C-alpha cells in the first residue's frame, strides 16, 4: 500500500514563483538519481508525479522519475542501460516510451510529443500533471514550465482536466482522476466533473487489464477508499460491479476501510498492506466482475471468495454472524479465506477482530488453518479406501473434526484418527452411500 508522506504545510508552492524551481530541484536531490542528468540530451525535462509531489511536499524517498526527451527515447534508454547496467522495458514502441529499471529505481523516458515541451504538456490529462521541470544546462538552472496553470490548481487543491478532448483521448484518464482526488485530497473542478460523468461509458473502450491495473492501484493506495467511493458515485464502475449490486451505502462502507480502522483492529503494517486492497475490491466486485476485467485466477478467487462470504454474513454488520454459522459452513469459510481472514476481520468489532486475528496468527490453530490430521495415502493403506471422491470426503470430515476440537490439534493419535475414519465409513455404508468395508 502506497503510504505517501504527509503534505508539507510549508511546501514549495508557498515560495515566491522565482524560487520554486530551484527549491524543487534541490528537493529532488539529483545526485542520488541512478543516472546522471548530465547524460540526458539538452531540452530534457522531468514531468509527472515527481514534479507534482515535490511541489506538494509529498515526495517519496525514491520517486519514480518520468522524463520527456527531444530524441527517440527507446534508443536513449538502451544506451543508458549499457552504461549503467540497467534493464530496459519498452512500454510503447510507436510513441517511443521506455523504462529503465536499476538499483530499485524506475526511470521512464518518453519522446516529446509536439514541437515544444509546452505542446507536449498540453496533451496531458490534468493540469496538475502538466507541469515540467527542465534540467539545468550549463549556467542555466532548472525552470518550471506550466502552460496549463497547474501550479494554481495545485495551490487551490483542485483537479482540473486540460480539455474534454484530452480525457477522451484515453478514457482511462476518467478513472485516474478519481485516484488523484483521493490521494491528494483534491476537489474536482465542476466542468471537469461534468465531463467525467457525461463520458463514463467511454471507460468500457479501455482494455480491461488497464482498467483493472488502475483499480488495483487505487485499492492499494492509502486513500483508496475515497477514490473508489468517488468512482462509484460518478458511475465509472457500473460496467464491472458485482451482479448482486453493492448496497447504496457502499461509499459509506468504503469509508470504513481505512488504514486507521485496520490498525485499530490490530493489523500489523504488513497485514494491512495485504488486507485493505482485497477488502475494498470485494465490497464492489465478485468473481464474474474480475473475469470481465481479465484478472488473474488468483485475484478472482481471493476477491470472489471474500465477496461471497461478506454477502453470506449480511455485509459488514457481521458481529455474531460467524458464530451462528453451521459447522460445515464455518469450516468452508475458513478454508476459502485462510490467507485473507484479516480482510474479513476489518468488518468485525474491534474486540472480535483482535481475538480472531490472534488465532489466525497461530499457524497451528486447527480452525483458522484447517488441515486433515492424516493424508490420503495413509487412509488408503489402513482402510482400503479407493482414490476418488469418497477419499476426499473422508479427509474433509477429519479436517472438520480436528478444526472443531474433536480430534487433537497437535498430537495426532493415529489410532483415534483410524477409529474416527472407520466410524464415518460405516455410517456412510449404513446410509447406502458406500459399500461395506472390512474394517
PLM feature spans:
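Catalytic cores of the polymerase beta-like nucleotidyltransferase superfamily
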Residues: 1-439
Amino acid at each position: 500500500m502506497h503510504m505517501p508522506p504527509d503534505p508539507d504545510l510549508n511546501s514549495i508552492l508557498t515560495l515566491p514563483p522565482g524560487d520554486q524551481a530551484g527549491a524543487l530541484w534541490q528537493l529532488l536531490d539529483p545526485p542520488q538519481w541512478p543516472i546522471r542528468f548530465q547524460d540526458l540530451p539538452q531540452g530534457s525535462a522531468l514531468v509527472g508525479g515527481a514534479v507534482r509531489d515535490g511541489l506538494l511536499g509529498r515526495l517519496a524517498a525514491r520517486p519514480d522519475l518520468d522524463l520527456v526527451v527531444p530524441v527517440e527515447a527507446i534508443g536513449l534508454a538502451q544506451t543508458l542501460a549499457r552504461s549503467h547496467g540497467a534493464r530496459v522495458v519498452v512500454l510503447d514502441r510507436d510513441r517511443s516510451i521506455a523504462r529503465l529499471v536499476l538499483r530499485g529505481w524506475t526511470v521512464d523516458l518518453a519522446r516529446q510529443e509536439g514541437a515544444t515541451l509546452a505542446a507536449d504538456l498540453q496533451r496531458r490529462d490534468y493540469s496538475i500533471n502538466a507541469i515540467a521541470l527542465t534540467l539545468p544546462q550549463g549556467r542555466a538552472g532548472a525552470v518550471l514550465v506550466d502552460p496549463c496553470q497547474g501550479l494554481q490548481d495545485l495551490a487551490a487543491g483542485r483537479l482540473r482536466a486540460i480539455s474534454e478532448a484530452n480525457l477522451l483521448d484515453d478514457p482511462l484518464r476518467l478513472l485516474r482522476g478519481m485516484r488523484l482526488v483521493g490521494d491528494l485530497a483534491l476537489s474536482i473542478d465542476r466542468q471537469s466533473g461534468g465531463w467525467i460523468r457525461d463520458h463514463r461509458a467511454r471507460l468500457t473502450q479501455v482494455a480491461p487489464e488497464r482498467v483493472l491495473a488502475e483499480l488495483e492501484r487505487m485499492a492499494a493506495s492509502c486513500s483508496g477508499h475515497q477514490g473508489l467511493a468517488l468512482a462509484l458515485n460518478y458511475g465509472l464502475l457500473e460496467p464491472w460491479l458485482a451482479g448482486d449490486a453493492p448496497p447504496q451505502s457502499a461509499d459509506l462502507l468504503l469509508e470504513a476501510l481505512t488504514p486507521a480502522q485496520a490498525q485499530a483492529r490490530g493489523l500489523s503494517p504488513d497485514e494491512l498492506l495485504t488486507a485493505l486492497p482485497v477488502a475494498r475490491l470485494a465490497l464492489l466486485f465478485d468473481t464474474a466482475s474480475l473475469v470481465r476485467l481479465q484478472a488473474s485466477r488468483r485475484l478472482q478467487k481471493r476477491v470472489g471468495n471474500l465477496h461471497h462470504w461478506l454477502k453470506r454474513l449480511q455485509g459488514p454488520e457481521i458481529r455474531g454472524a460467524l458464530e451462528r454459522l453451521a459447522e460445515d459452513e464455518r469450516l468452508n469459510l475458513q478454508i476459502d479465506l485462510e490467507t485473507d481472514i484479516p480482510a474479513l476481520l476489518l468488518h468485525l468489532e474491534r474486540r472480535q477482530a483482535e481475538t480472531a486475528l490472534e488465532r489466525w496468527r497461530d499457524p497451528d490453530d486447527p480452525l483458522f488453518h484447517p488441515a486433515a490430521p492424516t493424508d490420503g495415502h495413509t487412509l488408503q493403506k489402513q482402510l482400503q479406501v479407493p482414490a476418488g471422491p469418497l477419499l476426499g470426503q473422508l479427509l474433509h470430515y477429519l479436517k472438520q473434526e480436528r478444526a472443531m476440537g474433536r480430534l487433537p490439534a497437535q498430537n495426532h493419535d493415529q489410532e483415534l484418527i483410524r477409529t474416527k475414519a472407520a466410524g464415518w465409513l460405516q455410517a456412510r455404508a449404513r446410509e447406502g452411500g458406500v459399500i461395506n468395508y472390512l474394517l
